[in-house]
Amino acid sequence: MGREIDEELIITPPELTRTIETAPAYSEELLKTATDKNYKLKTLRRDKQQAEADSKKNDRYDGQLKASRVDMQLADVSTEEEKVNIANDLKKKLDAINTAAAEYQNKKDANSKAKIEWEQQQKSAKLGLVSAVELQALELQYEQTEMELSAAAYAYDLAWEEYNMLMNGTTLDIYDVYKSKLS
């Protein structure tokens, strides 16, 4: 698991020319897909089955039978709580995708506008209508919008990756704690 400490970390830049997709609409079918693959729910179901099996054994004392029934009730409550958590996480991930998609589109538009403006000012500079300092300022502004576009593309890709991980049943607990400490 993981990688060697001295292994080179390869980061591939996002594709900036792709079409921007919005997230699918929240539905019960989408929630069912997410809950079917969730490992916590599978664990809770297994715990309940174990408690049911323990409660059916004839060699148990009254206290042990009550404990098994309490374990079954606890598993039921925990299962419902986890389903609510998954539904809330799914809604958050879908909102994050749509927010990142809108931001990405805004940055694409701003970048194309800055590029056109910079190219026009380069032509004006050749004619002597714009000073070298003004041209450098516009170039810097254009490069700034390119950086913002790249950051928006990474955020968009990350939002989709988080959604895909949730839908595949991958837990994001450690990642969410790390992300919350960064912000």
Segments the model singles out, each with a brief description of its role:
Residues 46-49, 53, 70-73, 77, ...:
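Generic structural signal for well-ordered, non-membrane alpha-helices
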Residues 1-66, 174-183:
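Amphipathic alpha-helical coiled-coil scaffold segments and their short linker/junction regions
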Residues 102-150, 154, 164-165, 171:
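Charged, solvent-exposed structural "stalk/scaffold" segments
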Residues 44, 68, 75, 79, ...:
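Amphipathic alpha-helical coiled-coil segments
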Residues 86, 93, 128-131:
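Alpha-helical heptad-repeat coiled-coil segments that mediate oligomerization/polymerization in large
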Residues 79, 150-183:
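Acidic, low-complexity, intrinsically disordered peripheral segments
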Residues 79-87:
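Short, charge-rich amphipathic alpha-helices with coiled-coil/heptad character
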